[in-house]
């Protein structure tokens, strides 16, 4: 098993690439509303090299090199080098690095780093969730009226999911205190784990978006599933909803199906 302190150190070092964002000006278009910068590439190259040297037996899956064959029954690193690339391009400082260690469809270790606030979230299966060394827990809200939610808009599939997503968002907004849109699913899931927001949902996420965050949420006492309440497993693409058990159940039952 990978050493947690070593992994945290690698992620913290990689965070300097986001803070020094001049290279973000070099942008490649991957698809509709889908971009990659030199920062994404530098973070992934750095982390793949560091992880490969220390743990050569563990497979690697990164967003910027996601076409390799992966055996998810074995150990695999799952990395989003910059979750919130569009934010990075605009210098809207809500981007993160998300790293998970998975095996057999389960996340064993999850780390999310927000370099602009220097907040490092981590969780190890069965050992709780932490923020900069402090144990964190999901909120205790029981009703929608108590809640502030975060959401994502599935911007890469606007034509397919745009109208549906905003119908769901509207229903949640009308019954809750308020809603927020950060542009980084990993941050939103981490902040759900910390109880700062009461729940998060997005129609279509990739495995590198949710792999670390789902462990943070579950180890903080919450639930993270797809919109139907099904386990996320190792789905390459999935809807994701998370929150404390009561709020998660409300979202699945009344708002997202």
Please give the residue ranges for each predicted region:
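N-terminal subdomain of lithium-sensitive/metallo-dependent phosphomonoesterases centered on the IMPase/IPPase/PAP
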Residues: 1-82, 256
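Residue-level signal for inorganic ion chemistry
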Residues: 18, 40, 51, 85, ...
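Short secondary-structure boundary/capping segments
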Residues: 27-28, 52, 67-70, 112, ...
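Acidic active-site catalytic centers that drive phospho-/nucleotidyl reactions
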Residues: 40, 63, 80-83, 87, ...
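Short coil/turn connectors at secondary-structure junctions
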Residues: 56, 73-74, 105-108, 144-146, ...
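DPxDG-like acidic metal-binding loop motif
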Residues: 71-130
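An extended, acidic
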Residues: 137-257
